[in-house]
Amino acid sequence: MITSEEIKARLWNGSNELRGSMDASRYKDYMLGLMFYKFLSDQTLKTFATTAGISKEEDWFEEYKNAHQEYDTELEKMIQDILGYFVRPEHLYQTWVQDMNAGNFEVQKVTDSLNQFERSIAVTNGSDDFKGLFSSSTLDLTDTALGSNLNERNKNIQALIRLFEDLDMVALQNGDVLGDAYEYLIGQFAMESGKKAGEFYTPHQVSEVMAQIVATNQNITSIYDPTVGSGSLLLTVKKYLSEELQKSL
């Protein structure tokens, strides 16, 4: 599996190549948004495969599509009950990649996928957990900063999707590599953004001190960040809590 340092270098170098003149505080929304959507897609496939007893990872995508055709909303409900969300086959990150490989990728399909995810969450459990996560104000794929015309935006967005294409986000998350990479990217984007960084990032040294203070309390039932931007402070707190305590939150 790719190491923490390898993934940090790969993602940061990739972001520098792809973002062009776009401000770092803006580009982070696109990069981290698609990175998270890849995780949601991977987790959906992993959950389906585990439940269905499918061991060969290369079969998960096709088997999921076939199962969805047969069971439709029944399958969606099963995954929803386990994860709290689901991603339909036609909206999976893997489907975008498949379309790219076939030469029929359209940016609009990415927008449709992100919008459908939010709608499905709102309808199925009424939760606000994901509300606005992929809104057009955060991930505006028509933004001319991504390219002056549709073809250029199409090319740049495909390149960004390719950056996460072969990464197993579930495995990386289980090994804390994903969290480390996320924190690293947030920190790098913050340094690039200068004064604007205060809007979305608590300096890591401050997060460490706060996390260590909070973690001394073994009777924690909830943790809140009143000024949450990137969520990096909550990730830092998690590192100092026992696995048992993490599960109880």
Q: Would you name each region that the model predicts?
A:
Residues 185, 189, 228, 241:
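Short, small-residue-rich loop/turn micro-motifs
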Residues 225:
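Class I SAM-dependent methyltransferase core
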Residues 221-222, 236:
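Secondary-structure boundary/capping motif
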Residues 230-247:
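Conserved SAM-binding loop of SAM-dependent methyltransferases across substrates and taxa
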Residues 216-221, 242-249:
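Secondary-structure transition/capping motifs at alpha-helix termini
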Residues 1-221:
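Non-catalytic, mostly N-terminal accessory regions of nucleic-acid modification and defense proteins
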